[in-house]
Every structure is written in C-alpha cells, then in structure tokens.
C-alpha cells in the first residue's frame, strides 16, 4: 500500500495517502504504517518519519512530509500559526443549503475515550464548510441497494429522509483529532459511512453502497520551508469515492 508521490524536493515530500493506511507507528498497530514506509522506502529517519500532520486511517488524500529536521520545525510552526490551508471533501447525510462555520471546542468523550465530542472545556476548534452539490438516492436506486427490505422498511427509510445527501467542501482552521467528523456530527450532518460518528444503524445502511468513510483531503497550501514560496497542491478524488457519487443523482 505505497502512497503516490504528488510532489517532492530536497526538503519535503507530498503524498497521496490511500484509505486503510495508518499514519503513525504504535504498539497497538500491527499493520505497516506510513511512518514505516517513509523510513524504509524514502530513508527519512527524523522523528515520526517527518510526518507533519495526521490523516485518519480511512481518510484518503494529501499528506505533507518533511525530509529534514529544519523543514519539519518550519512546517509544524505553520500549522500551529494557522498559515497552512487545508480543504477536504465530505459526503454528509441531509441537505445542506448554505455555507457555515462550526465553532465548538473538542475533547474526548468521557463515556467513550476512543471518540471525541464538542465540549466546553475542550480545545478550540473551527471548521468552515460550503455545499458543493446536493445529491440523493432515488426510489429505484434505494430498491437496488436494499433488495431485501420490505415495504414497511422502505417507507421507514423514506420517512427518515435517508436518501438525502450533500457533498461539502470543508476547511478546518484548527487541527483537532477527528475535527471535521465531530463538527459535522454536531450539526446533524454526519459523514457517510463514518463508523465512529454516523451511528450504528446509519453506518450499516451506508456500508451497503459506500465502502468506507467519505472523507478526502483534497488540497493543501503552505509556505515552502526553504524558499518561503506559497505552494498549493491537490489530490484527485479516488476511484472508490467517484463510484459512490455515481450511485447518487443530483
């Protein structure tokens, strides 16, 4: 599971991370990680393999890696000072008609330490979002996806407005763990096929037609750590998520 190179020079490496690849090595992680690949295949021996920021295991897309300690310090400082610009594409439940901003501090869920929630005593978190396209699963397509459902079950889906979705462009202004996922759940528009935050029943329905969480790191902008030049790099939506959009109609 080797990531594609989007850009590289003597100071940095920008990769297109495939879904399913864990970023950081840890005792609890048994599979090969991006950190392992960077140290072995790219001979990057600095801390964390030079990884500047994280992406969740099932999130695909653009990730920034430093090749030197000095470049790592510079890029991490840009994240801390909010110079870096990031954009994600997320397919969410429900119809979102207007752009908005979610400002909600995020902390660990006291009832489940593996999850995060909006908490007054959490760390500051801000996410901007804007609708790209409103989409739906029509009656015929719902029948194709759920052929084993009877009329009562199908009516229940329609009553719950299950077939309504929006493709969002999300711009996190801070970098909290699970930030986009938590914020979209908080405004009642959870990401499609998000096992942690969509809810068990919804997740099971989503998995019938969406193979993984629909969250893709599409774009990143930053100052080059050596030249100071502003750079913007992009990752195309992967084939598995393109197929998901083809299932839906606008």
Spans of features found by a protein language model:
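RNA pseudouridine synthases
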Residues: 1-250
């Amino acid at each position: 599971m080797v990531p594609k190179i989007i850009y590289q020079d003597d100071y940095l490496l920008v990769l297109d991370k495939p879904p399913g690849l864990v970023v950081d090595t840890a005792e609890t992680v048994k599979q090969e990680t991006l950190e392992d690949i960077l140290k072995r295949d790219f001979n990057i021996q600095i801390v964390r393999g030079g990884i500047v920021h994280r992406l969740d295991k099932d999130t695909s897309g653009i990730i920034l890696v430093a090749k030197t300690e000095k470049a790592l310090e510079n890029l991490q400082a840009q994240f801390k000072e909010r110079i870096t610009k990031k954009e994600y594409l997320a397919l969410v439940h429900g119809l979102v008609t207007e752009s908005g901003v979610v400002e909600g501090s995020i902390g660990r869920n006291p009832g489940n330490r593996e999850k995060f929630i909006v908490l007054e005593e959490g760390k500051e978190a801000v996410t901007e979002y804007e609708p790209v396209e409103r989409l739906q699963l029509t009656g015929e397509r719902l029948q194709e996806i759920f052929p084993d459902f009877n009329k009562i079950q199908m009516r229940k889906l329609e009553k719950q407005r299950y077939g309504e979705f929006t493709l969002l462009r999300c711009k996190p202004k801070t970098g909290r763990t699970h930030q986009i996922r938590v914020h979209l759940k908080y405004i009642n528009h959870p990401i499609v096929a998000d096992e942690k935050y969509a809810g068990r029943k919804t997740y099971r329905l989503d998995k019938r037609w969406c193979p993984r969480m629909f969250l893709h790191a599409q774009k990143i902008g930053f100052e080059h750590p050596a030249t100071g030049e502003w750079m913007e790099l992009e990752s195309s939506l992967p084939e598995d998520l393109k197929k998901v959009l083809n299932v839906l109609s606008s």
